[in-house]
Amino acid sequence: PVQSVFSATRCGAN
């Protein structure tokens, strides 16, 4: 779950 959230946040979900 951590990697999923990190990936989404880094994608541009700021």
Curated annotation (Swiss-Prot):
Domain of life the protein comes from: Viruses
GO biological-process terms attached to the record: viral translational frameshifting
Name of the molecule in the record: Protein 2B*
Source species: Theiler's murine encephalomyelitis virus (strain GDVII) (TMEV)
Lineage: Viruses, Riboviria, Orthornavirae, Pisuviricota, Pisoniviricetes
